Design a protein with these regions (language model features):
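Conserved glycine-rich cofactor-binding loop
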Residues: 7-11
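Conserved glycine-rich Rossmann-like NAD(P)H-binding loop of the short-chain dehydrogenase/reductase
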Residues: 23-38
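Rossmann-fold cofactor-recognition segment
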Residues: 43-61
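Hydrophobic structural elements of the Rossmann-like NAD(P)H-binding subdomain
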Residues: 80, 122, 199-202, 212
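Catalytic loop of short-chain dehydrogenase/reductase
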Residues: 86-89, 120-194, 206
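C-terminal helical subdomain
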Residues: 106, 174, 179, 201, ...
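Short, flexible catalytic-loop segment of classical short-chain dehydrogenase/reductase
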Residues: 130, 203-214
């Protein structure tokens, strides 16, 4: 039985992988090979059979190659889609939509073709998914992600024209990308349910991962209103995912 973790080279993805049953074959994927090698070494030291496979989730062909590789190792039973980017990573608004939103489409579609009854996909969203007022969420554009990617991105980012601050523009695009993840996970759950495949999304707050630490300056504003008053740990999220 195979468990695939996108964005599994570090952070909550790797933490979740370490908490999977020891009989799982773990495949960690990402774009930084040095991180993947370290992750595989840690997983093997913990007693797992583990492999690394580079993957750019913003490209369908790369996701397809990952799915095919995982299927060649055994029955894919778990997919944890933790790969993503945030505004502090110096990416464009379009990058945020392509990697976070369209990447989720590619992962769910390509892996579901190779999964069977009893398997599970967990798409990692964000608390930011719920930070945008409903009137500003372009849900009517979401279905375009499967039929016209360019138009989907154009319509999803339409409201950013009214935002002047560059970081706030990217923050809005990020929130929309993660709101899309929650929507698409629900859509996938409905579509794949008859095959016995479960799909769920998880929306973390600010987590002390490499990506989360980049957001800590702006995220401090959110922490001031949180009940814990601190960032979450990758291990806490890994437990919730696994």
């Amino acid at each position: 039985k195979v468990c695939v973790v996108t964005g599994g080279g570090s952070g909550m993805g790797l933490a979740a992988a370490k908490l999977m049953p020891k009989d799982r074959i773990i495949v960690v994927s990402g774009r930084t090979e040095s991180k993947l090698k370290k992750a595989v070494a840690q997983l093997k030291a913990a007693g797992f059979e583990a492999y690394a496979k580079s993957c750019d989730t913003s490209k369908r062909e790369s996701v397809t190659a990952l799915a095919e590789y995982a299927a060649s190792l055994g029955e894919i039973i778990n997919v944890i889609h933790a790969a993503g980017v945030s505004p502090a990573m110096k990416v464009t608004m379009e990058d945020l939509l392509r990697i976070n939103a369209l990447g989720t489409v590619y992962v769910n579609q390509e892996f579901s073709k190779r999964m069977h009854k009893g398997s599970v996909i967990v798409d990692i969203a964000s608390m930011s998914a719920y930070s945008v007022p409903d009137l500003m969420v372009p849900k009517k554009a979401y279905a375009l992600a499967e039929t016209d990617e360019a138009l989907f991105i154009k319509k999803a980012l339409r409201m950013t024209a009214f935002i002047k601050d560059a970081y706030m523009k990217n923050g809005f695009a990020y929130a929309i990308s993660k709101n899309f993840v929650t929507w698409y996970a629900a859509k996938s759950a409905y579509e794949y349910g008859p095959k016995g495949i479960r799909v769920a999304s998880l929306s973390p707050g600010l987590i002390a991962t490499d990506m989360g630490n980049l957001e800590s300056e702006h995220g401090g504003e959110m922490l001031a209103f949180s009940c814990e008053g601190r960032m979450g740990t990758p291990e806490e999220l890994g437990f919730a995912i696994a």
